């Protein structure tokens, strides 16, 4: 059985640091990809990237409540911004190494933003404050199903990775983010755009293997939503 590494958050639970990956990601790897999920911790001393790459066949970079530290792209953070700099220290070097090595990877939500920052891009920290932009945040005080409900359409790049995987030109996606791509990293290319022009998915022009980043959460209904099924099936074929 192929193995897919799932990068964990480092969070406090009952005053203790824990390494966490939501069950939806684990289930999507197990059932949507047909691979063994392997949790990769984000430790205060980052693990050796070469050792990680040697033990897995692919990597999944997950979403998280925290944000990539703005210092990673030369900006400052507002007071109260939730960060996970231990995760940054694990994921950013790992993304660069995986891209260089041609390791198949799928990056979701925070992982999508990490991919852009790791390769030299930057982020808008508060999309809803930009003139003419949608509010990409999830509804407040809503049920979990309502939070992850389809929120807006995305339009795929013609002949791009998502268009080829899904056979679609457009699809509805969920939206649970307040940050997003500002400057696109060298080598990355837009795969999907929201109605306000915000980049919602990327691939890499020089990728040696499957490399896809999406701002939305395909893991939430990976077995039901046609686009999500296509994404995880494409990832599986690349392992």
Describe every region a protein language model picked out.
Residues 109:
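Conserved G/P- and acidic residue-centered "switch" motifs that form tight phosphate/ATP-binding loops
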Residues 212-215:
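Active-site-proximal beta-strand elements of phosphoester/diester hydrolases
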Residues 208-210:
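A short, structured beta-strand/loop element
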Residues 112:
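The feature captures the ABC ATPase H-loop/switch
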């Amino acid at each position: 059985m192929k193995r897919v590494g799932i990068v964990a958050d480092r969070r406090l639970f009952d005053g203790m640091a824990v390494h966490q990956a939501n069950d939806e990601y684990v289930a999507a790897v197990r059932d949507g990809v047909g691979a063994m999920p392997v949790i990769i911790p984000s430790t205060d001393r980052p693990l050796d990237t070469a050792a990680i790459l040697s033990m897995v066949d692919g990597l999944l970079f997950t979403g998280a409540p925290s944000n990539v530290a703005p210092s990673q792209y030369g900006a400052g953070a507002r007071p109260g911004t939730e960060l996970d700099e231990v995760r940054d220290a694990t994921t950013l070097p790992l993304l660069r190494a995986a891209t260089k090595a041609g390791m198949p990877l799928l990056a979701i939500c925070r992982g999508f933003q990490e991919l852009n920052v790791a390769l030299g891009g930057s982020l808008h920290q508060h999309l809803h404050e930009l003139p003419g932009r949608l509010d990409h945040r999830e509804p407040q005080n809503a049920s979990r199903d309502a939070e992850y409900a389809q929120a807006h359409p995305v339009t795929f790049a013609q002949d791009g990775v998502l268009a080829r995987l899904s056979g679609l030109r457009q699809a509805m996606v969920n939206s649970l983010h307040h940050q997003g791509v500002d400057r696109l990293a060298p080598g990355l290319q837009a795969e999907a755009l929201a109605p306000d022009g915000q980049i919602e998915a990327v691939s890499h022009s020089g990728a040696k293997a499957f490399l896809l980043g999406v701002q939305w959460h395909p893991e939430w209904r990976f077995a039901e939503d046609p686009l999500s099924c296509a994404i995880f099936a494409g990832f599986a074929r690349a392992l």
